[in-house]
Amino acid sequence: MCGISGIASRRLRPDELRPVAERMARSLRHRGPDGTYVQCFSPPTTTECLALGHNRLAIIDVSEAGREPMSNEDGTLWLTFNGEIYNFREVRPRLEARGHRFCSRTDAEVIVHLYEEKGPDCVSELDGIFAFAILDLARNEIFLARDRIGVKPLFYAATHDSFLFGSEIKAILASSLIEPRMNRQAVSDFFTFLYVPCPETAFEGISQLPPAHTLQLRLHDHSFSIKRYWEVARDEGVEHCSYEQLKSEIRKRLAAAVERQLVSDVPLGVFLSGGVDSTVVAGLAKEAKADIQTYTLTLPGDEYRFYNEAVKGRAVSRHLGTQHCELPLEVPELDSILDLVEFSDQPFANPTSYLMYELSKKAREHITVALCGAGGDELFAGYPRSAAVRLARKLEAVPRPLVQFGGKALALLHDSHRNPRLRRARKFLRGLNSDFFVQYCHWTYFLSEGEKHKLLNGDLARQTDGNGLKPSAEILRSAFNQCSLSEPDNCVLEMDLKTFLADNVLEYTDRMSMATALEVRVPLLDCGFVELGLNVPFAYKIRHGRTKAVLFDAFSEFFPSEARNAPKRGFNAPLGQWVGRLFDDYFDIHGRRSGPVREKLGEDVGASWREGILDIGFIQQLRTEHHRGKSDRSHELFACMIFDVWWRKYIRKTQPLVHW
């Protein structure tokens, strides 16, 4: 994995180009500690000033021959690439047979020569996780592409005289050609989802290229077109397979994906929580590579037992025979959690990002590449909401007053942040009277449209009320309507894959691992396996009360007895226990000029509500509900804190950026 960046500008003179391109590349140096390189082009070679940047994390062919940006034989094509191409060993001989000359053993060089053969259609033959840019001097174009599922990120911005791109938003901001301004729609969506959905970003004028899309920039007029090149297709053959046939096919295809993703010239291991997905990946890795290492992040202390994965991880490792390493996590300081906003460059309030950062940082002392189990929940109905969809359908026959009575009874119970099950049950019952996508927002996400209208104050609130901003549930509706699978329940899973997985799980997986220069691979998101998994009949996914049933049964021998019936916990952080004690100080309405939060985070803590962006009255209401145990509001309050940090660092620019 690496970091990529680039610029095409009519505004810059040749002597101004290199300093800008170097600033952009240097901002991504955490993604590639093995070298930062910039290649510049200017008239008369080109019609305007162009530059490509690359930060290298060497994985395949670590020699200087793999250095990027790299070109084809005659220098008419130049590539900067982030990711891994898993089928490069199959593609390369075909290209060599057609006369292409290779100068390295890298997977990246295959892209250059495949583009020579196929042009933009080259992406259809690439199996991997990637984001790349090709400067095509002969066609006077820049071609951008992002992998099918969205494992690797790619952002871009276009002005009247410049086009910029990068693996992270910070590369674009580092150019100083884009003034950071808040995107109101994105901020509204953030307070629903706790992340910003693609293709929006929190900055006006900066977008994210969606997964499975390409972008062609025509340099003669800076016009560009975006095109989808892949979509999950319905597979009637899979739909009609028996349970036993599908177990066999799942095993065969996933084993092949894991074996392909074990290729590395540097140390490699597996993240192991002891859950179904990571256990399956670890078991297959062990079958293919006898000396596989596994790593588990542990949270010592009885108060964290709901979140601690140590016991299950240890049991699975012992059962599989892996070389196991437990990585204990200390209770973090608030500033260390909040400063992680700099790795996303926009509001992102899933506290699991901190766990991924610490796991990656600690594992990086031992390995450079890790395999993880991301994707299993979306493919095989592992989340509680997958069962909720079916339960809601059954409850349609239950009289509404009875359902409402159940909701009122749950409201009387004291809510504890130590166990999220009560919160889920309340949200489930609250959403039953709504349109399906509004229901799903209730079950899965956080602030409702009505609550956001109370929180988002001043100009932002007026925009949200009546000036063209869309309800966040429309993002889910749009993703669902693009699905072509035969079963509605599987379409919901695909919707999750396109939204929750791509914009949340893969966002923090990439940003937090690459912040430590660790490459994370995701075998369950091999595109062929994704197509298989989403087409498996839903009845095989939730079966006899077990979620992910067919996946578990396909690999049942990998699970020790103590892990077979353990409840799903997920990779979650004990947010309420970590930051609850600091809410009072952060949201102090009187603006005390002392206290641990202000000492570490700056005297302008709370600028976003003092300046009328957020409504402190509604925040106080959330605090009251939280303190009285009426409702666990730790995630919503944490989101307000994250937004305030982002606002001060990126929009007001009153707080320094500590990580870049």
Which role fits each region the language model picked out?
Residues 339-343, 364, 386-388, 578-580:
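Short low-complexity, flexible loop/linker segments enriched in glycine and/or proline
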Residues 148, 358-417, 500, 505-529:
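Active-site adenylate/phosphate-handling loop in enzymes that bind or generate adenylated species
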Residues 1-344, 356, 360, 556-557, ...:
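Cysteine-centered catalytic environments shared across enzyme families
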Residues 1-4, 8, 97, 121, ...:
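Adenosyl-5′-phosphate
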Residues 27, 31, 88, 151, ...:
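Phosphate/oxyanion-binding loops and surfaces in catalytic or ligand/nucleic-acid-binding neighborhoods
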Residues 38-40, 153-156, 280-283, 379, ...:
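Generic hydrophobic alpha-helical membrane-span motif
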